[in-house]
UniProtKB/Swiss-Prot annotation:
GO molecular function: chloride channel regulator activity; voltage-gated chloride channel activity; voltage-gated monoatomic anion channel activity; volume-sensitive chloride channel activity
Full protein name: Chloride channel protein 2
Intramembrane region spans per record: 170-177, 245-257, 261-269, 503-517, 518-519, 520-531, 532-536
Modified-residue entries (Phosphoserine), positions: S767
Biased composition (Basic residues): 650-660, 696-705
Compartments where located: Cell membrane; Basolateral cell membrane; Cell projection, Dendritic spine membrane; Cell projection, Axon
Membrane-spanning segments: 94-127, 136-161, 186-204, 211-229, 281-301, 327-355, 364-383, 435-455, 463-486, 537-554
Residue ranges with Polar residues bias: 710-720
Topology class, membrane: Multi-pass membrane protein
Residues at the site labelled Couples extracellular acidification to the channel closure: H536
Length: 907
């Protein structure tokens, strides 16, 4: 009986609208294995059957300040003061401004504290290395042990507390902003795991980044802040406002990371949104600017800076920063960076795929989860050991010190009439005794390239923006030093001579490679804000645009690649310059076998429709012959209809009618035994997978004011009925009446898979009539067969009268735009009101990937080659379809909504 109830709760939860994905921790990235799957159904069933969350109080339970005045405790007085202050601030300032100020302040404090802790960790490693320079073996052990311990701690701490904190965070935020709910992704424990894990990972000195994880951290901070402010009431009780605040939080994450508010807003829009609501523009700029300001003020307060300056300030020439003849060199940097960015994304994805295909190694490393990050860290630390191979790749420099030296405007080569100002101490790392600048830069680029691609697969909180940024700066510096060597006297223009500035080439290379990996143009703006100079705006823009053009034609962005690795729901971008996307139409890609129910169907038809599809929506048509689309109905509504029709309450009513018909007239005058006088206790020991899963079988789906008394009574009686009869009914409904032994074994097997088994004793009250008048299983099955043949009354169901619809000749390009703009996951295809197919996110994704490229060969749908674009529906077909609209008036369903209503419902 417990298994039958658990199975019913699972099936009843299949139609719940929130979409959640099951997270599975793998060796590297982790992935979401259930595509809107069983985990969401179980969670929906638990929430529906178990009631509201324990931390959420009812709105009516919130006390007003007037009522709080009666309390004499100190807590009551503090609550009154806080409520009054909140009302004053809201009336004078506004809720959005308060939220954005708090968000910017908190993120600036977190960013500064993390930078301070990371700097202390890196200084400790350098101090240990210098203190043991007399013994090369001890120095090596200290150099490799320190990062291995930090990375291992970061991986273990994250795995234990919140595995969702692993990785960048931008791919998941892109999915969340599209409407998908990721379980435990914006919680407090994930925030703690992300902050501590990222601090340890970056403090180890591995080639990892901070920008991507900080987007996730800012989003978690915004979600937690929204929950806190919702305790005071106001607009943050509305969950739809959280999406707007998450969009602003993504901008804050980049802004407080690099003190680049403008570039942070633009970068967050490019990497997380396909279509951006302009109403959120000012929120992102305000919060990012305030956060960047506080972040730099804290640096001045800590005496790290004398005043508010750029993070990597440069001193390039302003009167003549570059010559026109240098533009081809900048263009070469952009094209080469495009190929390099595509190669980096490909290499990163291949590392993950190869490790997953090696089943034996993968199985072994999954059992020893900390072994893989420890081995990768040991390998990278060994290669960067300064007295060893690290001397040929500036291994003793941190990422910040590396960028400072690469952006230096002085040349490192000593040939001809070059500017000899004396290299700074950190620049000496690029000129080892047994190598020159060019060899060191080449080795640095090649080694850091594959090291960064490998290090970003470690299951710790980390990003890839900063390592790619450093590699691009090194490549630009290599081109700049080469130009300075080829033109030692500079490029002659008229009577003036201007020497080459290699630091400018490094800035161009950093922006180009970072833009190629992320498929963004806003990296140019980030570079300008990082360096504090805009002198090289034209070379930077040329290189970034060329790099994006090359990279987008070869590989997806790094974040889209991770989305595919983690198997998150996504909608790929349409390739530009492809004419196939305009010739492919919806009728070529739609699924013609649409799960639907007719208005005049029986309950048997409903059960058959549930067995045929696992989707959360069913189309409601006028009749199987006309196929006129009347609306859509959720799967949960259909399950509720079937459950109410075959409920124990209806079966008891049927038994009472039979008993009254069999009784003689004198016996009819006798009063039936009162339920108050003959009550017995039934004690059932049950195994429940959900807390409170047996408290009630079905939660009414309509508000209490809209339900009739008979419906409410039947549902309430159904919850306290005999569980054995309910189990037989549910098995007959969802399992097609299988043998009792096989059903029992399957239910026991499903129970064994449940991780949260709770032993609970259920005490219910049952009358004598219920105990004495039981029906046999054969009688129950016969009665259920009769009930399944009755017609369905949809008047008590919630029906969407205006589901999103497309016509069969809608192009693939327009369909992609509609799905991206509205965030819908399915659309019905109609022809003059007649349902002919359905298009889901899965079919659209396959069509886009097939029409753009498939293994290097363009693929077109089969019907696209035989279509005549000039043809249209015949007059006979049009007349026949219009004739079907007449009988619709006899049905009492809500009329179809306007297209604007449909758009609003799909958002």
């Amino acid at each position: 009986m417990a298994a039958a109830t658990a199975a019913a709760a699972t099936v009843a939860g299949e139609g719940m609208e929130p979409r959640a994905l099951q997270y599975e921790q793998t060796l590297m990235y982790g992935r979401y294995t259930q595509e809107l799957g069983a985990f969401a159904k179980e969670e929906a069933a638990r929430i529906r059957l178990g009631g509201p969350e324990p931390w959420k109080g009812s709105p009516s339970a919130r006390a007003t300040p007037e009522l709080l005045e009666y309390g004499q405790s100190r807590c009551a007085r503090c609550r009154i003061c806080s409520v009054r202050c909140h009302k004053f601030l809201v009336s004078r300032v506004g809720e959005d401004w308060i939220f954005l100020v708090l968000l910017g302040l908190l993120m600036a404090l977190v960013s500064w504290a993390m930078d301070y802790a990371i700097a202390v960790c890196l200084q400790a490693q350098q101090w240990m290395s210098r203190g043991l320079n007399t013994n090369i073996l001890l120095q090596y052990l200290a150099w490799v042990t320190y990062p291995v311990v930090l990375i291992t701690f970061s991986a273990g701490f994250t795995q234990i507390l919140a595995p969702q904190a692993v990785g960048s965070g931008i791919p998941e935020m892109k999915t969340i902003l599209r409407g998908v709910v990721l379980k435990e992704y914006l919680t407090l424990k994930t925030f703690v795991a992300k902050v501590i894990g990222l601090t340890c990972a970056l403090g180890s000195g591995m080639p990892l980044g901070k920008e991507g994880p900080f987007v996730h951290i800012a989003s978690m901070c915004a979600a937690l802040l929204s929950k806190f402010l919702s305790l005071f009431g106001g607009i943050y009780e509305n969950e739809s406002r959280n999406t707007e605040m998450l969009a602003a939080a993504c901008a804050v994450g980049v802004g407080c990371c690099f003190a680049a508010p403008i570039g942070g807003v633009l970068f967050s829009i490019e990497v997380t949104s396909t279509f951006f609501a302009v109403r959120n523009y000012w929120r992102g700029f305000f919060a990012a600017t305030f956060s960047a300001f506080i972040f730099r003020v804290l640096a001045v307060w800590n005496r790290d800076e004398e005043t508010i300056t750029a993070l990597f300030k440069t001193r390039f020439r302003l009167d003549f920063p570059f010559d026109l003849q240098e533009l081809p060199a900048f263009a070469v940097i952009g094209i080469a960076s495009g190929f390099g960015g595509a190669l980096f994304v490909y290499l990163n994805r291949k590392i993950v795929q190869v490790m997953r295909k090696q089943k034996t190694i993968n199985r072994f490393l999954m059992k020893k989860r900390l072994l893989f990050p420890a081995l990768v860290t040991l390998l990278i630390s060994t290669l960067t050991f300064p007295p060893g191979f690290g001397q040929f790749m500036a291994g003793q420099l941190s990422q910040k010190e590396t960028l400072v030296t690469l952006f230096d405007n002085r040349t490192w080569v000593r040939q001809g009439l070059v500017e000899d100002l004396g290299a700074p101490s950190t620049s000496q790392a690029w000129s080892p005794p047994r190598a020159n600048v060019f060899l060191t830069l080449v080795i640095f680029i090649l080694m850091k390239f594959w090291m960064s691609a490998l290090a970003t697969t470690i299951p710790v909180p980390c990003g890839a923006f900063m390592p790619v940024f450093v590699i691009g700066a090194a490549f630009g510096r290599l081109v700049g030093e080469s130009m300075a060597a080829w033109f030692p006297d500079g490029i002659h223009t008229d009577s003036s001579t201007y020497r080459i500035v290699p630091g400018g080439y490094a800035v161009v290379g950093a922006a180009a490679l970072a833009g190629a990996v992320t498929h963004t143009v806003s990296t140019a703006v980030i570079v300008f804000e990082l360096t504090g100079q805009i002198a090289h705006i034209l070379p930077v823009m040329i290189a970034v645009i060329l790099a994006n053009a090359v990279a987008q034609s070869l590989q997806p962005s790094l974040y889209d690649s991770i989305i595919r690795i983690k198997k998150l729901p996504y909608l790929p971008e349409l390739g530009w310059g492809r004419h196939q996307q305009y010739r492919v139409r919806v009728e070529d890609i739609m699924v013609r076998d649409v799960p639907h129910v007719a208005l005049s169907c029986t309950f048997r038809d409903l059960r058959l429709a549930l067995h045929r599809t696992k989707g959360r929506m069913l189309a409601l048509v006028e009749s199987p012959e006309s196929m006129i689309l009347l609306g859509s109905i959720e799967r949960s509504q259909v399950v509720a209809l079937l459950g109410a029709q075959l409920s124990p309450a209806r079966r008891r009513q049927h038994m009472q009618k039979l008993r009254k018909a069999q009784m003689s007239p004198p016996s009819d005058q006798e009063s039936p035994p009162s339920s108050e006088t003959s009550i017995r206790f039934q004690v059932n020991t049950e195994d429940s997978g959900f807390p409170g899963a047996h408290g009630q079988t079905h939660k009414p789906l309509k508000p209490a004011l809209k339900r009739g008394p008979s419906n409410a009574t039947s549902l309430q009686e159904g919850t306290t009925g005999n569980m054995e009869s309910a189990g037989i009914a549910l098995r007959s409904l969802f399992c097609g009446s299988p043998p009792l032994e096989s059903t029992t074994s399957e239910l026991e097997k499903s129970e064994s898979c449940d991780k949260r088994k709770l032993k609970r004793v259920r005490i219910s009250l049952a009358s004598d009539s219920d105990l004495e008048g039981k029906m046999s299983p054969e009688e129950i099955l016969e009665w259920e067969e009769q009930q399944l043949d009755e017609p369905v009354n949809f008047s008590d169901c919630k029906i969407d009268p205006a589901p999103f619809q497309l016509v069969e000749r809608t192009s693939l390009h327009k369909t992609h735009t509609i799905f991206s703009l509205l965030g819908v996951d399915h659309a019905y295809v109609t022809s003059i009101g007649r349902l002919i197919g359905i298009v889901t996110l899965k079919e659209l994704r396959k069509a886009i990937e097939g029409s753009v490229t498939a293994q290097g060969v363009k693929v077109r749908p089969p019907l696209a080659s035989f279509r005549d674009s000039a043809t249209s529906s015949s007059d006979t077909e049009t007349t026949e379809v219009h004739a079907l609209w007449g009988p619709r008036s006899r049905h009492g369903l809500p009329r179809e909504g306007t297209p604007s209503d449909s758009d609003d419902k799909c958002q």
